[in-house]
Amino acid sequence: MRVVVALIVLALVAVAGAAAFVYLGLYNITATDQHTAPVFWVLKTTMRRAVITHAKAVKVPALGGASQVARGRALYTVHCARCHGAPGVASEPFALGLRPSPANLANTGIEWKPNELYWTINHGLKLTGMPAWEFRLRDDALWAIVAYVQRLPYETPREYRALLGREQPQSPQLAKATKASDVETPDTLQPAPGDPDRGRFVILQYGCVVCHDIPGVVGAAIPVGPPLAKMGMRSFIGGRLANTSENMVRWLRDPQQFVPDGAMPNLGVSERDARDITAYLESLK
């Protein structure tokens, strides 16, 4: 009997503690701050399991025809790339400020089944910024996007631009930000040393964790880019550029200068932010 009473008391204390935590507003809900690892895991696991469960009833039509994929590519560019990016194309600046960060769909296109992709695009996801397209696009358009998302992981930036029939799309805001950051620090001034603590904070704001596994930053469980653990001990950046502070700053600010057809897009990283991110990456040993 004592054990039962003790368990009841513990349960009541736990409920009261949880209620107090919520009521007092102790959890930081700002979009500039990352989720804790346990919260991120709960959110991600809940979302994934819900999609798998509810998408089972979706019947998948024939997918993968050339015209369907081409249509899906065009629709994806207009409606999806603003948040999720595209091969060699960055997300819009506003999307980098969403938390959780919109997923890079290169891995999603491989790991997720077509019925799961359709269900998610059709119904959207609460508390993620992912809208429901059910009443905004026709059903055949949604399936065309699904067909393209399945093709996306195998498409290079050069192929994407060529197949789209125009130059790499980039928002005027991002283009302006990139141009402005190029003249932020005059060559006559000695750049300030990087701040690794700020760098850890800033690296989240540019969505780097969507593609890379970064120690100390909560993000994608299955990153599509190389992990950045022990970056401070590596000899090269991207397998081709000597790993020095100045080279890392140059790489962060304009990666396509070194790999024109690489998947890593230009994000309009400012001089100061690049130096702080560099300082944090150099601390990873």
Regions found by a protein language model. Give the residues of each.
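Periplasmic c-type cytochrome electron-transfer domains
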Residues: R2-T77, R82, A86, P93-F94, ...
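Short, intrinsically disordered, charge-biased short linear motifs at domain edges
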Residues: G65-A70, P193-G199
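Amphipathic alpha-helical recognition patches that constitute DNA-binding helices
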Residues: R71, N104, E116, R198, ...
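Periplasmic/extracellular electron-transfer cofactor-ligation site
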Residues: R73, T77-P100, K126-G129, P153-R158, ...
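Short helix/strand-bridging catalytic loops that position acidic/His residues to coordinate divalent metals
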Residues: R99-N107, P131-A132
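Conserved N-terminal glycine/acidic-rich loop preference
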Residues: L163-P196, V209-M233
